[in-house]
Amino acid sequence: MRTPRSLRSTPAWFSRAGWLVVLALVALAVGAFFVLRRPSVHSTATLVVPPPRGLAIGLDEENANLLGTTGAAAFAPWRERLGAVEPSFVRLDVVWSKLQPSADAPPDWGAQQSGCLRDLPPCAPYDGLRGQLRALAEQQRAHPGRFVGYVDLFGAPPWATVPRHGCVPPGVGPTALALSDAGLAAYRRFVSGVLSLARSEGADLRYWSAWNEPNQPAFISPQRARCATDAQALSPASYAALVRELQGALAAAPGDHRLVLGETAAYDTPRPTALSTVEFVDGLPHDVVCASDIWAQHAYVGTEGIGPVASLAGDPGRAGSATLLADLERVLERRGCPTPKRIWITETGVGGPKPGGPRPTDPAALRGQCRALNAALTAWYRDPRVDTAFQYTFRQDDSYPVGLVDTGLTRAFPTYDLVRAWSTRGFSTDGPPPVPGSCR
């Protein structure tokens, strides 16, 4: 994010070099970066001050009873705990197929949700996406400048997709199939509807991702023309079409809305049914890969590799996925976009030795998980290209157990204390916080 500021005329004794030093120090102090323009009677000079290194914290949570400042009484203590994290960003997963299952009816923005987590209590109903946006707006009013909305779209309604073709793994459902031409037009209308709904509820949805994990067959299929690593990659073109439709919808809407590219699953090498992150970036058209200066990458924390078969996370499993991120940074540079990419880690978390696998919850294991996540956050803080890390999720999803509090809302894990400590630093450029006592 760059904010232009006009500079007043400077005294003759104050050199341009002096301005550069002062401005760089100011940028480092406030944890921001700016595009600075100095007016002249002859010309306009533009100075870009690079962003300082640092790390902001985002959070993924869908339950409006937890996300807002009001809601069901049973959720109140945990709602307060989420609010105390004060994340810079909140990531909302918007599942198109659930909101508009039929082409003959408009999206049901208020479709009642149980508030359970995959049928597990505690439960309390809320009004679907409308309720989520209302809750987000409450937090944005209570915490100005924080809880900024980031939308991640996925889940194609079967009526909007192409027939099965190419390499589609047997377990992949119809909501993962690529969109047809008519489906792409409907997708743009759907995005426009979400934008309109957010305006009516007063929620700031600043950042937008066209599709979740587009290099993963459970979200876009086919990934390849046939199930072999040397087969033609198809998913980059499917994703590019989505990005262009999203660009059109955002450009037509009032307000400040920004595109985020990627949301890629952390596949470090090509697989027969999935593209590696590097392979996916290489396959994108130039206009798409250069359409934003932010690339979103998933990187969970674990201790074991995942083997040769594509799974939901796909992570190499090492803290911070340092090798994968280095490869990502190199391929993004190689694509030659005018503006260097910033990297957002839009899904992370820690649980078992294998990301997404069974999570030990004995005290020693939980402390070890906390220290492992802290190592990843510290590595990303030190990486000058990484700006943000999003915890997935607040309330633990038992199908992917890396949350900050348990599914039944009876206990907070040590990682809650850690994420809160990172998030509540004065500025994202402040150094890593002390490791909480619960993690030691």
Question: Which residues are covered by each model-predicted region?
Answer:
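Substrate-binding cleft and catalytic face of glycoside hydrolase catalytic domains
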Residues: 85-269, 302, 350-353, 395, ...
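Structural preference for beta-strand elements that scaffold enzyme active sites
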Residues: 54-58, 89-91, 146-150, 205-209, ...
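Boundary/entry segment of secreted carbohydrate-active catalytic domains
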Residues: 38-95
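Hydrophobic alpha-helical membrane-insertion segments, chiefly the h-region
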Residues: 25-36
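Short, acidic/polar
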Residues: 67-83, 187-197, 273-285, 370-379
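Noncatalytic carbohydrate-binding groove/subsite architecture in carbohydrate-active enzymes
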Residues: 141, 184-197, 201-206, 230-366, ...
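N-terminal Sec-pathway targeting helices
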Residues: 7-25
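Aromatic-rich peripheral "rim/lid" segments of glycoside hydrolase catalytic domains that contact
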Residues: 110-112, 200, 214, 219, ...
